Amino acid sequence: TLLKTLMGERLADFTIRGEIQTDLQSLAYIPQHLPEDLKKKTLHDYFFLDSADLDYSILYRLAEELHFDSSRFASDQEIGNLSGGEALKIQLIHEFANPFEILFLDEPSNDLDIEMVDWLKNNIQKMRQTVIFISHDEDFLSQTADTIIHLRLIKHRKEAETLVEHLDYDSYSDQRKANFARQSQQAANDQRAYDKTMEKHRRVKQNVETALRATKDSTAGRLLAKKMKNVLSQEKRYEKAAQSMTQKPLEEEQIQLFFSDIEPLAASKVLVRLENETLSIGQRILSQGLQLTVRGQDKIGIIGPNGVGKSTLLAKLHQLLSGKREISLGFMPQDYQETLQLDLSPVEFLSQTGHKEEIQKIQSHLASLNFSYPEMHHQIHSLSGGQQGKLLLLNLVLRKPNFLLLDEPTRNFSPTSQPEIRKLFANFPGGLVTVSHDRRFLKEVCTSIYSLTEHGLEVVDLQDL
């Protein structure tokens, strides 16, 4: 919404207050999702129907850099029929080959493989124009951004706050952690001092009350009553002072989850062995000659270019593992709708028995993930992608699987949630196979990485990521 507002779009469903001053003549924009009107355009019309300002030398150079066949520019293929990665590539080529003063990007790394993410990072670093982008990818943020605009909901997601810091992402993240620790310590100190003061006050008050009840002398009684009035006045001053004490900070987006009571399979137990396997969709061969052995406590990461068949490989592993009695399999798809029942509420989706105790436990878990009570009982389709992702994580934790298959597990989570996601899966006692282009996730969670190519799986050194 902020991005579209800065671009000058009128948003009928939102109230925009304030003033935007700009003298920009040209801008470039790549949205998170392919617009409906663009889906119906052919590649030819997209590139050449209105090409007065198109720089053809840049156009063909970018096609080569992004490994996109430039002969397809004149194709009648509709953009909506391209893969997510290809659709993003042609938008990057189109927007970068036209002149612009400012570039707006919405989650640009979502549909790019690691090689293409590196390409985009390098181009942003070299750009002289202003770039404003939304991203959840910490590695991408840390290597491109020099100013952070942090939009967040505080006070149990009831109040909006905007922070602007002219810092790179890692410095901003370190500053947030330091501020959080400092405020937590100050809040604890204030609370201890307040408790000590109130304990002393309660003793004085109790002594005066005891003396009042025991006295039979009217003069002494009047003096004690006056003293009690002063004590009560002091009590009100303490209560008022308590309102200005440093409050314990809440990490609004923190994910407080961990796997417990997991019975992992033996580390040496072979679950799947692929030998000279072929991956295909219909008649189209994606990759062949695959060799892979998966054991009970392996943590395997799969990387590779878009369209090579990473999700297809994960689906094959899902098929092979699902039929094994000793395996309790957890699955987190890239498209949450494959698992979530969108017409149910989060509580209904997570509940297996409907018993009161189970419902209370589920609501407690959801509350720890910053779900409001209404969100717990609204239909899942009304939740944001991040909230739906949290729901899937909680479902995994509650089902107690001993092996996991994860397809881009960090895709919809905010940067402030990412460290907790990595910690959750790094500490998972069972095994997992994950498809990801998130370098930090791969390095902190996985013990082995494979790159999927058309010729099979190749071992990748973690240090080379």
Language-model segments: residues:
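Walker B catalytic motif
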Residues: E107-P108, D113, L405-P409, F413-S417, ...
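ABC-family P-loop ATPase nucleotide-binding domains
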Residues: Q25-A87, N98, Q334-N395, R399-P401
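Coupling and communication elements adjacent to P-loop NTPase active sites across diverse families
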Residues: L54-Q77, Q175-Q283
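Conserved H-loop
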Residues: D137-Q143, E338, D438-E444
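Flexible loop/N-cap segments at domain edges
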Residues: K248-Q334
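Conserved beta-strand-loop-alpha-helix hinge in the C-terminal portion
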Residues: L153-Q185, L452-L465
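ABC ATPase nucleotide-binding domain signature region
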Residues: L3-Y56, T147, R152-R157, G296-K361, ...
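Hydrophobic anchor residue at the start of the ABC signature
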Residues: L92, L393, I421
